[in-house]
């Protein structure tokens, strides 16, 4: 053991207690939870792989802890020498163990956060971390604050709430790096841990829970963390839909009941109407074809039918409970007539395939008669979707099913009105109200699927059409004015543009067949048609024309997505031009949605300039909409990471410009963030509460507008920030070479975490790289360059220009929510960063003539960090958020081991001349096997690298992603 005296080594438990700050508060059980999980895991590790392997884990942990304490690079080299001496099988076990320990640390944190919330001792404040963030978006507290502090009347709050909509759009962006098999086991570990620390637990319960905990920890460790094949879009959709089944379905009515209670507590004796569109759900899974050739028209059709089948099944599973509950015989005359008619027409043998209420329901139970008919239709709706999905045809006639949500709501509303008329309102407001709210929220399609496609693909189709029609030069070469004129002439006319003889490439067929699928499926399957890389009005008009040509009876609303900096700047003028077109103004009926992209704008210009440009673009778009009398909904394409616009929900909403939310908000919930938002019932409740409360508060108590001098300063700073960012990322001739050497970007695709390719085009530089792998690669090395690059130059410029600007920046931080959130998020990223780790990657992987470039970037990191602290008035990082600070310190030592393992593994993969001396196997399980390391290595028999290296690398990627709690 490298000459160490194991007996003298501190146990990991003791190390933890030395490493972590003292309790942050009286209710702080984090270290206790973490130590228990770790203790159980290390015992399991020893049972499975022997004492030597456990001791190696402890040695690595101790070296990491020593590095974290003093930041001495020599400790990283010591770690490297231990890690590179491991044989392939041991290397996989060790990297898997550290990845597993980080997942356990995350679970301990989640249980601690839930514990702190339960006992309501949470200090109020603006925490920058989602899970540290306080309950200031508690719906009841928000109502009370609006009434008592801001003088709003309860009626004003009720009116605003009834007309408010938050639409959460689940996307399958490949950022969920944890397999579903593991997520489920993690959920059970979380449950066991929470119950173990519950009050009044008996010794027997405790023993059984402890056994369950150990079983689940072992099951998670013995599960292969690595996806051996990439998920298909259908896999992603099923994974996304599983959250509806597990938490969202029951979470929505539960949350709406809490809203009712909160309203009652401010004097409103009415419930939120069941059809108030307070919460809506949409999805991109199977609809987002932007750069993803695997999302075909057939995939879109399949996911729509699958979602309809799942929705019908969820209703069907609930309807019998409702039939049990509504056993009353009193009803209105109108209701009795309907029930008697249904009873007369019912067949005696029609219900044999049901478990409950399988005989003819007597007319003395009228509610059950009506609900029995609803059950029949739900059964047929589900089976018809199943048959269409499996065979493409169904023998169940459409009239035997529910074809639209109004048909479904009608008998339920009839039941509700009848119960209320007969004095049974308390019964009507029970499970029936919950059911009505579910139908209003989820409809028959569970979620509405957005379609997203690149503007260029529509141009290709119209180019083919104009060439086929032989109309002068090709559409692609026309001016914007020429395109608009022709598109409007066609939209105003009636003649079909093309027939079956149109010559089509595969790409053109794909676009047209997608519109065909939209025309064939029920219109409530779909939400918006989003055009990515939109730049001009013709992009929107082109989609309107293609919808008409492909016979879409209820055209989807068309949403331009503005992403790059130049497109954001030009967006208000493009939208104004659209609104000035009479045909278009009549088409939209006073409503327009515009999507703004956080990821690509950040990759294009850096975080500071992107954030400020997004802010200004929203202000200008709102002015344009007001001028033309259009209600504008902003759709925020935020990622999970700060580099892609992520951050705590309530702060993100409250820092938007005044008048840009107006009770209507759409926002993406991406990959890994879905699990953090909806993975557990209490997380689902918290997410719905935060979005609803913050949207209401933004409308009723808008944030302040920035002072003119703040704007002027930030305008200048943004120019400087963009210049520095682009001078490094796009103009430095060897930057791409440095990026590919210093990070695991080239190896990212091996993780199989999504169906979408990591590049828009197979070759090319940073421009062609998607925002997710771009951020992911820098996150892995803990350097986070895309987030902070440009900030330092901007702050330096401002202070150098006038020393008083520092005071102005500090005032902006104190008074302006947008600026505060921007700075706080950067501060959090610095707390998660470590230039010493990035330096190790450089030393091992980057050619010597680029070392000076890396050193210059790291000096920039340190200078930028100090300037951010100065602006925030902080001496240390995260001094205002002790909980997050504690949690990061707890994770750092695990992450450091994985970083060192990753850097040395990349060295072994990339450098054929790098030789290491392996020590004998240390894992007991491997020693007892005649097949040696092949037992673990055979899981990946096709790897092009030396045995075990690829799996070790992927495990380190997953572990670091888990430790930093955001991937891409």
From Swiss-Prot:
Q: Where in the cell is it found?
A: Cytoplasm
Q: How is its activity regulated?
A: By light-reversible phosphorylation.
Domain of life where this protein originates: Eukaryota
Coiled-coil annotated residue ranges, if any: none
* Major subcellular site: cytoplasm
Reaction catalysed by this enzyme: oxaloacetate + phosphate = phosphoenolpyruvate + hydrogencarbonate
What would you give as a GO molecular function for this chain, any one?
phosphoenolpyruvate carboxylase activity
Which Gene3D superfamilies does the UniProt entry name for this protein?
A: Phosphoenolpyruvate/pyruvate domain
The enzyme class is lyase
Q: What is its EC number?
A: 4.1.1.31
May I ask which residue range the UniProt record assigns to the signal sequence? none
The tissues in which it is expressed are: Expressed in roots and siliques, and to a lower extent in stems, leaves and flowers.
Q: Which GO terms describe its cellular component?
A: cytosol
Q: Which UniProt keywords apply?
A: Allosteric enzyme, Carbon dioxide fixation, Cytoplasm, Lyase, Magnesium, Phosphoprotein, Photosynthesis
Catalytic residues in the record: 173, 603
- List residues, modification Phosphoserine: 11, 705
| Assembly information from the UniProt record | Homotetramer.
Q: Which PANTHER family match?
A: PHOSPHOENOLPYRUVATE CARBOXYLASE, PHOSPHOENOLPYRUVATE CARBOXYLASE 3
Record's family?
Answer: Belongs to the PEPCase type 1 family.
Q: What is this protein called?
A: Phosphoenolpyruvate carboxylase 3
Protein's gene: PPC3
